[in-house]
From Swiss-Prot:
Protein name: Thioredoxin reductase
One Gene Ontology MF term: thioredoxin-disulfide reductase (NADPH) activity
Catalytic activity reported: [thioredoxin]-dithiol + NADP(+) = [thioredoxin]-disulfide + NADPH + H(+)
Binding positions for FAD per the UniProt entry: 34-41, 275-284
Enzyme type, top EC level: oxidoreductase
Alphabetical list of Gene3D superfamilies matching this protein: FAD/NAD(P)-binding domain
Extra facts: The active site is a redox-active disulfide bond.
GO BP term, pick one: removal of superoxide radicals
Gene transcribed to yield this protein: trxB
Species assigned in the record: Treponema pallidum (strain Nichols)
Amino acid sequence: METDYDVIIVGAGAAGLSAAQYACRANLRTLVIESKAHGGQALLIDSLENYPGYATPISGFEYAENMKKQAVAFGAQIAYEEVTTIGKRDSVFHITTGTGAYTAMSVILATGAEHRKMGIPGESEFLGRGVSYCATCDGPFFRNKHVVVIGGGDAACDESLVLSRLTDRVTMIHRRDTLRAQKAIAERTLKNPHIAVQWNTTLEAVRGETKVSSVLLKDVKTGETRELACDAVFFFIGMVPITGLLPDAEKDSTGYIVTDDEMRTSVEGIFAAGDVRAKSFRQVITATSDGALAAHAAASYIDTLQN
């Protein structure tokens, strides 16, 4: 069976780059295709503190660079293109991108997830003009300004801490009366003198003329609304899996791809790893584990095709 590669990995986050390392170690011809920047969600981590083996925390960016260097050193090729379709004919996968086409005997989908949108007035209108989903990327534009963070989970807390080093006016808006983040991150957030939390509050609208100037808030207990002046709004209210390339694969009730313990999807020859798959806990370490398992399973699958 003649193909360009043994395995093509879609996505160069922690799961994809881990899969690339293990695929290459299994002597598979490996291509990683990434439409944006390698690193995925890890790039948003200001300080990676809970990854085994790193006694001294490193930034998500540094971690991503290390992962890429390892994958390339093992022999992986990385193409920065956007995959448009994945098809299968006679046990061969055909992957098309905006600039070319490739064939492979197996595919590992490591496309991850993207930030959930609220769909409220002003959110899309002010994107890039005060509305953002990445504090690490856009925070420096609002140095010494008043910024609002929407959410109460790990991402919201972590990004609020990032912003607190750029400004002393960070206001978190959370619809509940306690943070949902891991205890250590939540405690660090609440102790930060530059971060204030408005509890039991929802965001109703983002307002402004040419850029963000305020937000409309609602007290979930009383129904009372009020306006809060600010310069930027950062949204961290959860993630949505990126599964459009695999519409026929089995998914759970929230849209994540269902796999078995070896990362096999319901489509033979396609494996899923990282935040795109259904699981109870999503961290960098679980993504890298998924990637290793997916590569191992892909190698076993290819063996069955060749023997």
